[in-house]
Amino acid sequence: ETTGATFNFDFWRTCEPRRSTYPACRAVIAAGLQTLDARRAMYDAIQNAYFLDARNPSLSEELISISGEIGLDSTLFADDLGSNEVASRFAAERQACRNFGVTGFPTLIWSWQSADDEDASPRYGLLAAGYTNLDTLLSRWRSLMN
């Protein structure tokens, strides 16, 4: 069984693969400094650049180019990409992952907030670490909601 996902295999012929996704992760955070919606837009654009366009999301120049393509201020993005603020936020997000026991992908963490208390901090729960069938996923989600 396959997902039907499209993948441009030219990446392996035209790019020098790197083993780190950290630059792409920092790019998502840097995009989010401009607008919250930009985090998702950058994530989607990086996925398309890698899987469909055979572009290397480990390269800062590619990430800066992508930022302009999705309508961000690419000069500001370039500054933010290497900033202490982005490094600090990325470190905090990695620590949060370690706190959940995340060691790989795919991982699904559910975030929710009480409708009765808008000032309460969001709560988080681990739904899946690695492949999880739908029945198990739904069971875990229901237990978090109770």
Model regions and ranges:
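C-terminal cap of thioredoxin/glutaredoxin-like
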Residues: 45-146
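Structural alpha/beta surface segment adjacent to cysteine/selenocysteine redox centers
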Residues: 1-54, 59
